[in-house]
């Protein structure tokens, strides 16, 4: 840094905060470290006794924090994400659309293990809204060597660390199972719950059928729904270990690839996810009907963003997989589903 007269500081970058005190009104930083001095700032600086200033001296191979933040932003921001203007050395990443936030956790860790820089993000694999803040980038010092930023870019890799996958409204099917509903002994209260949850994402139910506990009938209904063009197929009921619960067998008999039957999530341990020629077929346990949030809420955004679900993905849900059933639900702004 170098010391210059305040009148000569226009366009220069401050190396430290400058405090202003107005008795009875204000005491705090009037100008922050990293601020670029403007012509209108000169009278203010002089009025608070700053005849001289320490400013950053541009040197080859040394980057200012705003320049470094821009490089971090470039490494981090992918599809459907834009950045704010640099402010105090920080750039924030913002979602351009409603969708699913995906984070390359290994790349994020690699960047944050690089000395003197950071990217702080919200949790991935959860729904985000257009305009929502996703992450922030900055370096720790005011200036940094170009070679350190080169090391960061090498650690980050060639692909963006964060992407937002847009949601795609889909036609879906609900196949209600259980002799108690099929024979009219109780009302189907499951289907309206699903219709409501899917409507939040602009989806429409285009197929619905009620079956008894005969696996062959459930299998036929699933295949019929797929032939009708349904892009998501949900079966309700029949997912436990009771002898009359045959829905998992029915799904298997369609020829679908079973990704997992069972998940380390409560509520939602008896969940089943499979793919039938690329179409998701999910067996939903009864908790989806009565619990505020379940594994269904964790995975539905991924299904609507066409993000393939693997057995490892399900296994990872064990950390953060316990819903506390709070009196006032704040999901996804809570620990449920965060791993």
Residue ranges, per PLM feature:
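Solvent-exposed alpha-helices and their adjacent loops that cap or buttress functional pockets
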Residues: 7-11, 29, 83-86, 126-128, ...
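Flexible, glycine/charged-enriched surface loops at secondary-structure junctions
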Residues: 55-56, 81-86, 144-146, 204-208, ...
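Short, low-complexity N-terminal leaders and the immediately following helix N-cap/first helix
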Residues: 1-88
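Residue-level recognition of short, solvent-exposed, well-ordered loop/turn junctions
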Residues: 32, 38, 43, 123, ...
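C-terminal terminal segments
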Residues: 29, 33, 85, 100-118, ...
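Extended, charged alpha/beta regions that create polyanion-binding interfaces
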Residues: 59-167
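Glycine-rich phosphate/diphosphate-binding loop of Rossmann-like nucleotide-binding domains
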Residues: 158-213, 217
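Short glycine/threonine-rich loop/turn motifs
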Residues: 179, 189, 206-335
């Amino acid at each position: 840094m170098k010391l210059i007269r305040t009148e000569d500081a226009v366009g220069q970058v401050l190396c430290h905060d400058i405090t202003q005190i107005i008795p009875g009104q204000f005491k705090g930083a009037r100008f922050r470290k990293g601020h670029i001095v403007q012509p209108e700032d000169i009278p203010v600086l002089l009025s608070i006794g700053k005849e001289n200033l320490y400013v950053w001296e541009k040197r080859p191979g040394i980057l200012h924090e705003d320049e470094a933040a821009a490089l971090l932003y470039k490494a981090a921001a992918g599809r459907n994400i834009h950045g704010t203007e640099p402010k105090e050395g920080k750039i924030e990443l913002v979602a351009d659309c409603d969708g699913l936030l995906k984070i390359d956790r290994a790349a994020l860790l690699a960047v944050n293990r690089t000395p003197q820089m950071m990217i702080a993000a919200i949790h991935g694999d959860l729904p985000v809204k257009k305009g929502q803040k996703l992450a922030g980038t900055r370096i720790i010092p005011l200036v940094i060597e170009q070679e350190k930023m080169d090391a960061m870019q090498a650690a980050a890799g060639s692909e963006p660390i964060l992407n937002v996958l847009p949601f795609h409204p889909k036609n879906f099917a609900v196949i209600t199972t259980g002799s108690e509903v099929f024979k009219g002994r109780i009302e189907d209260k499951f289907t309206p719950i699903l219709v409501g949850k899917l409507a939040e994402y602009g989806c429409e139910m285009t197929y619905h059928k009620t079956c008894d506990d005969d696996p062959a009938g459930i299998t036929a209904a699933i295949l019929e729904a797929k032939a009708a063009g349904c892009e998501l197929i949900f079966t309700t009921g029949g997912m436990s270990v009771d002898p009359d619960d045959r829905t998992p067998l029915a799904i298997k008999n369609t020829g679908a690839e079973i990704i997992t039957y069972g998940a380390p999530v409560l509520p939602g341990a008896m969940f089943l996810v499979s793919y039938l020629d690329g179409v998701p077929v999910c067996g939903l346990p009864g908790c989806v009907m009565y619990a505020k949030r379940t594994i269904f809420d964790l995975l539905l955004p991924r299904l609507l963003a066409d993000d393939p679900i693997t057995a490892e993905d399900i296994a990872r849900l064990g950390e953060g997989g316990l819903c506390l059933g709070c009196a006032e639900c704040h999901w996804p702004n809570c620990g449920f589903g965060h791993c």
